[in-house]
From Swiss-Prot:
This is Arylacetamide deacetylase. Its EC number is 3.1.1.3. Its main location: endoplasmic reticulum. It comes from Mus musculus. It is a single-pass type II membrane protein. Belongs to the 'GDXG' lipolytic enzyme family. The gene is Aadac. Disulfide bonds join 115-339. The keyword Cell membrane does not apply. It catalyses: a triacylglycerol + H2O = a diacylglycerol + a fatty acid + H(+). One of its GO terms (cellular component) is endoplasmic reticulum membrane. N-glycosylated. It is found in: Endoplasmic reticulum membrane; Microsome membrane. The lineage of its organism: Eukaryota, Metazoa, Chordata, Craniata, Vertebrata.
Amino acid sequence: MGKTISLLISVVLVAYYLYIPLPDAIEEPWKVVWETAFVKIGTDLASFGELLGISHFMETIQLLMSFQEVPPTSDEHVTVMETAFDSVPVRIYIPKRKSMALRRGLFYIHGGGWCLGSAAHFSYDTLSRWTAHKLDAVVVSTDYGLAPKHHFPRQFEDVYRSLRWFLQEDVLEKYGVDPRRVGVSGDSAGGNLAAAVTQQLIQDPDVKIKLKVQALIYPALQALDTNVPSQQEGSHFPVLTRSLMVRFWSEYFTTDRGLEKAMLLNQHVPMESSHLLQFVNWSSLLPERYKKSPVYKNPTPGSSELAQKYPGFIDVKACPLLANDNILHHLPKTYIITCQYDVLRDDGLMYVKRLQNVGVHVTHHHVEDGFHGTFSFPGLKLSERMKNQYLSWLIKNL
């Protein structure tokens, strides 16, 4: 009897975690199911631990992910070292092959919803050493303070300090980087930070060396409207759901779950900040194919108290899509990846449109069978294709 019950429970658990309906267009569905199941198991463990008062949701996932970190080991192609730029930990990847000329420099910012991840995580270490070797570039992969221990603007400030340090002439010279060929890149929350620091840099008169390019990989760019079409469609998208993304956004600003609840209802922007909604109005910024089903409605005004306590969600340093056109106009050549089955899809699409409207040179790669986090799954054919296209653009433009 006991064995039968155990078997039954096992079958139910396997079915629960492996029953993940996927869009027909997604390639290698079983691999995607397994990856999504692992994410689901991790978030369920974190939720259970939080419910019991054992640990904060994000701290549990941080612990689980720490087992996937790797040491800064050099290989036959790349020398890897760790240091600090203005007290911010960074991992540096330098190609071993001799070069008579100065190399490109790429400053990379990892994703993880401002709460998770590190330059040492195996997926980011793999990406950085691959990029350094294939691009023949010096890659700096930066860390930054994570929530819930640190909230906005700590993440932005850490990344900006680290980038400013890298852009000093003597630092670039030390690592053999051509000051005319430096770019910034990041994925997801890292794409958010990459966009934000790039905007800040063009307004900083103290930084003489400017970025040549920015490459944003499925970036998160706004927290004002949590009900854009991709969010409405994305309750069951692989890896990143709407509810998890809202949790990441709210944790970026505070551990107060009241903000999360308001964001889930899309009732967090106060009336006095409603003018900012013009910058995220998907009815005018999205391609027609995404405007057919849902009908655009202005979010219901929220509490002024929330915005006063946690002003980050209406701050351009946290939400780069809120930048004025006169700032966007000065941005460098830009590459943006968006994925069809990603709750952040529309953030990227709206940014593409706004940059095009002000004359920025934008290359937009929309992946029809893509989903959030693909770069972090090196075993997928789709991941390899996307990374190769990313690399090709960097080779031509950086």
